[in-house]
Amino acid sequence: MDRHLFLFGGGPPFTSKLAKQFAKQVSTHGGKVALLILERANWQEYMPKYTNTLMEQGIREFNYIPLPTVSAEEASRILRNSSGIIIGGGNTELYAEFIVKTPISKVLKEQFSDGVPIAGFSAGSLICMDKCIVSAKDNADQVFKYQAGLGLLKDTVIAVHFSEWIEESHLRKAVTLFQPSLNFGIDEGTGLYFLNNKLIGREGNGVFRLKNNQLEKIEMQL
Protein backbone atom coordinates (compact mmCIF):
# COMPACT_ATOMS: atom_id res chain seq x y z
CA MET A 1 0.00 0.00 0.00
CA ASP A 2 1.09 3.56 -0.65
CA ARG A 3 2.14 5.44 2.49
CA HIS A 4 0.94 9.04 2.90
CA LEU A 5 2.56 11.40 5.41
CA PHE A 6 1.76 15.09 5.90
CA LEU A 7 4.10 17.17 8.08
CA PHE A 8 3.23 20.72 9.14
CA GLY A 9 5.68 23.18 10.66
CA GLY A 10 3.19 24.75 13.06
CA GLY A 11 -0.29 24.30 14.42
CA PRO A 12 -3.49 23.86 12.39
CA PRO A 13 -5.20 24.42 10.05
CA PHE A 14 -4.29 22.29 7.05
CA THR A 15 -3.27 24.30 4.02
CA SER A 16 -5.97 24.11 1.35
CA LYS A 17 -4.36 21.78 -1.21
CA LEU A 18 -2.95 19.47 1.44
CA ALA A 19 -6.38 19.32 3.09
CA LYS A 20 -7.79 18.23 -0.25
CA GLN A 21 -5.10 15.59 -0.70
CA PHE A 22 -5.48 14.26 2.86
CA ALA A 23 -9.27 14.13 2.50
CA LYS A 24 -8.94 12.28 -0.80
CA GLN A 25 -6.88 9.55 0.85
CA VAL A 26 -9.23 9.41 3.86
CA SER A 27 -12.22 8.93 1.58
CA THR A 28 -10.66 5.90 -0.10
CA HIS A 29 -10.50 4.19 3.31
CA GLY A 30 -14.00 5.04 4.52
CA GLY A 31 -13.96 8.67 5.62
CA LYS A 32 -13.40 8.58 9.40
CA VAL A 33 -10.60 10.69 10.96
CA ALA A 34 -9.05 10.22 14.42
CA LEU A 35 -7.32 13.10 16.22
CA LEU A 36 -4.61 12.30 18.77
CA ILE A 37 -4.23 15.33 21.02
CA LEU A 38 -3.10 16.22 24.52
CA GLU A 39 -5.80 16.73 27.13
CA ARG A 40 -5.93 20.35 28.25
CA ALA A 41 -8.53 22.81 29.43
CA ASN A 42 -11.19 23.56 26.82
CA TRP A 43 -9.47 21.39 24.21
CA GLN A 44 -12.78 20.87 22.41
CA GLU A 45 -12.89 24.54 21.44
CA TYR A 46 -9.63 24.16 19.50
CA MET A 47 -10.68 21.16 17.41
CA PRO A 48 -12.40 23.11 14.60
CA LYS A 49 -8.96 24.44 13.65
CA TYR A 50 -8.08 20.88 12.66
CA THR A 51 -11.41 19.83 11.24
CA ASN A 52 -12.93 22.81 9.40
CA THR A 53 -10.73 22.57 6.31
CA LEU A 54 -11.38 18.82 6.10
CA MET A 55 -15.13 19.34 6.47
CA GLU A 56 -14.94 21.66 3.48
CA GLN A 57 -13.58 18.64 1.59
CA GLY A 58 -16.50 16.45 2.63
CA ILE A 59 -15.09 14.70 5.71
CA ARG A 60 -17.80 14.44 8.36
CA GLU A 61 -16.73 11.85 10.95
CA PHE A 62 -14.12 12.73 13.58
CA ASN A 63 -13.10 10.79 16.67
CA TYR A 64 -11.15 12.68 19.32
CA ILE A 65 -8.53 10.97 21.48
CA PRO A 66 -7.41 13.29 24.30
CA LEU A 67 -4.35 11.79 26.00
CA PRO A 68 -3.79 10.49 28.59
CA THR A 69 -7.49 10.62 29.54
CA VAL A 70 -8.30 8.03 26.89
CA SER A 71 -6.44 4.80 27.62
CA ALA A 72 -3.90 3.39 25.20
CA GLU A 73 -6.19 0.40 24.67
CA GLU A 74 -9.20 2.54 23.76
CA ALA A 75 -7.05 4.83 21.62
CA SER A 76 -5.71 1.82 19.74
CA ARG A 77 -9.23 0.56 19.09
CA ILE A 78 -10.31 3.92 17.66
CA LEU A 79 -7.19 4.21 15.52
CA ARG A 80 -7.68 0.75 14.02
CA ASN A 81 -11.11 1.86 12.82
CA SER A 82 -9.91 5.15 11.35
CA SER A 83 -9.40 6.14 7.73
CA GLY A 84 -7.07 9.02 8.54
CA ILE A 85 -5.08 10.09 11.60
CA ILE A 86 -4.03 13.53 12.83
CA ILE A 87 -1.41 14.00 15.55
CA GLY A 88 -1.77 17.43 17.05
CA GLY A 89 0.62 20.06 18.34
CA GLY A 90 1.70 20.88 21.87
CA ASN A 91 4.32 19.53 24.26
CA THR A 92 6.55 17.30 22.14
CA GLU A 93 7.96 15.33 25.06
CA LEU A 94 4.47 14.52 26.33
CA TYR A 95 3.36 13.41 22.87
CA ALA A 96 6.34 11.08 22.79
CA GLU A 97 5.54 9.75 26.26
CA PHE A 98 1.86 9.09 25.56
CA ILE A 99 2.21 7.84 21.98
CA VAL A 100 5.70 6.65 21.02
CA LYS A 101 6.32 4.85 24.31
CA THR A 102 2.92 3.13 24.42
CA PRO A 103 1.09 0.46 22.37
CA ILE A 104 -0.43 3.30 20.34
CA SER A 105 2.83 3.50 18.38
CA LYS A 106 2.44 -0.03 17.01
CA VAL A 107 -1.08 0.69 15.78
CA LEU A 108 0.03 3.91 14.09
CA LYS A 109 2.81 2.09 12.25
CA GLU A 110 0.42 -0.65 11.15
CA GLN A 111 -2.20 1.80 9.91
CA PHE A 112 0.42 3.86 8.10
CA SER A 113 1.75 0.75 6.35
CA ASP A 114 -1.81 -0.14 5.36
CA GLY A 115 -2.21 3.16 3.52
CA VAL A 116 -4.04 5.21 6.16
CA PRO A 117 -2.80 8.82 5.80
CA ILE A 118 -1.19 10.42 8.85
CA ALA A 119 -0.79 14.16 9.39
CA GLY A 120 1.35 15.75 12.10
CA PHE A 121 1.32 19.33 13.30
CA SER A 122 4.44 20.71 15.01
CA ALA A 123 5.01 18.22 17.86
CA GLY A 124 2.97 15.70 15.90
CA SER A 125 5.37 16.09 12.98
CA LEU A 126 8.41 15.66 15.19
CA ILE A 127 7.29 12.37 16.71
CA CYS A 128 6.60 10.93 13.24
CA MET A 129 10.31 10.93 12.49
CA ASP A 130 12.81 8.16 13.15
CA LYS A 131 14.55 10.56 15.55
CA CYS A 132 12.26 12.93 17.43
CA ILE A 133 14.50 15.97 17.86
CA VAL A 134 13.33 18.65 20.28
CA SER A 135 14.64 22.19 20.07
CA ALA A 136 16.07 23.94 23.10
CA LYS A 137 13.29 26.48 22.52
CA ASP A 138 10.68 23.73 22.93
CA ASN A 139 11.41 22.25 26.36
CA ALA A 140 11.65 23.45 29.94
CA ASP A 141 15.32 22.47 30.24
CA GLN A 142 16.17 24.68 27.25
CA VAL A 143 18.57 22.13 25.78
CA PHE A 144 18.78 20.19 22.51
CA LYS A 145 17.12 16.81 23.05
CA TYR A 146 16.31 13.73 21.01
CA GLN A 147 14.63 10.38 21.47
CA ALA A 148 13.11 7.63 19.38
CA GLY A 149 10.17 8.61 17.21
CA LEU A 150 7.60 6.56 15.33
CA GLY A 151 9.93 6.02 12.39
CA LEU A 152 7.33 6.83 9.73
CA LEU A 153 10.00 8.79 7.85
CA LYS A 154 13.58 7.54 8.16
CA ASP A 155 16.99 9.02 7.45
CA THR A 156 15.48 12.50 7.66
CA VAL A 157 15.53 15.22 10.30
CA ILE A 158 13.18 18.19 10.56
CA ALA A 159 12.90 21.43 12.48
CA VAL A 160 9.49 23.06 12.95
CA HIS A 161 8.54 26.73 13.47
CA PHE A 162 11.74 27.20 11.48
CA SER A 163 11.80 30.88 10.53
CA GLU A 164 9.63 31.97 13.45
CA TRP A 165 11.98 30.45 16.04
CA ILE A 166 15.16 31.16 14.02
CA GLU A 167 16.10 27.48 14.04
CA GLU A 168 18.95 27.26 11.52
CA SER A 169 21.50 26.49 14.25
CA HIS A 170 19.18 23.79 15.65
CA LEU A 171 18.84 22.16 12.24
CA ARG A 172 22.60 22.33 11.71
CA LYS A 173 23.18 20.60 15.03
CA ALA A 174 20.73 17.83 14.15
CA VAL A 175 22.31 17.32 10.71
CA THR A 176 25.82 17.24 12.17
CA LEU A 177 24.82 14.73 14.83
CA PHE A 178 22.78 12.31 12.73
CA GLN A 179 24.11 12.84 9.18
CA PRO A 180 20.73 12.15 7.54
CA SER A 181 20.19 11.93 3.80
CA LEU A 182 17.50 14.62 4.00
CA ASN A 183 16.75 17.56 6.26
CA PHE A 184 13.99 20.16 6.31
CA GLY A 185 13.23 23.34 8.21
CA ILE A 186 9.47 23.91 8.01
CA ASP A 187 7.83 27.26 8.70
CA GLU A 188 4.48 27.74 10.39
CA GLY A 189 1.56 27.67 7.98
CA THR A 190 3.49 25.24 5.81
CA GLY A 191 3.08 21.55 5.05
CA LEU A 192 5.05 18.82 3.27
CA TYR A 193 3.50 15.78 1.60
CA PHE A 194 5.50 12.55 1.43
CA LEU A 195 4.35 9.63 -0.70
CA ASN A 196 6.22 6.41 0.04
CA ASN A 197 8.96 8.37 1.86
CA LYS A 198 9.50 10.74 -1.08
CA LEU A 199 8.69 14.44 -0.87
CA ILE A 200 6.31 15.17 -3.72
CA GLY A 201 4.90 18.55 -2.71
CA ARG A 202 4.79 21.45 -0.30
CA GLU A 203 2.31 24.23 0.34
CA GLY A 204 2.38 27.38 2.41
CA ASN A 205 5.28 29.52 3.52
CA GLY A 206 8.95 28.59 3.66
CA VAL A 207 10.66 25.21 3.58
CA PHE A 208 14.44 25.10 3.87
CA ARG A 209 17.25 22.56 3.80
CA LEU A 210 20.96 22.42 4.38
CA LYS A 211 22.81 21.35 1.24
CA ASN A 212 26.59 21.42 1.00
CA ASN A 213 26.51 23.25 4.33
CA GLN A 214 24.45 26.10 2.84
CA LEU A 215 20.87 26.90 3.81
CA GLU A 216 18.58 27.02 0.78
CA LYS A 217 14.87 27.51 0.27
CA ILE A 218 12.90 24.76 -1.46
CA GLU A 219 10.60 26.21 -4.12
CA MET A 220 8.64 23.04 -5.02
CA GLN A 221 4.86 23.44 -4.84
CA LEU A 222 2.10 20.84 -4.69
Where in the sequence are the language-model features?
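C-terminal and late-domain segments of enzyme folds
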Residues: M1-T28, L38-L54, V134-L222
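Residues at the starts of beta-strands that form the adenosine-phosphate
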Residues: H4, K32, E61
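Structural motif
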Residues: F6-L7, G84-G88, A119-G120, I158-A159
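Short glycine-rich anion-binding loops that position phosphate/pyrophosphate groups of nucleotides
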Residues: G11, G89-T92, G124
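Class I S-adenosyl-L-methionine
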Residues: E39-R77
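Flexible gly/pro-rich beta->alpha loop and the following alpha-helix that scaffold active-site loops
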Residues: Y64-P117
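Class I SAM-dependent methyltransferase SAM-binding "motif I" and its flanking Rossmann-like core
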Residues: A96-F98, S105-E164
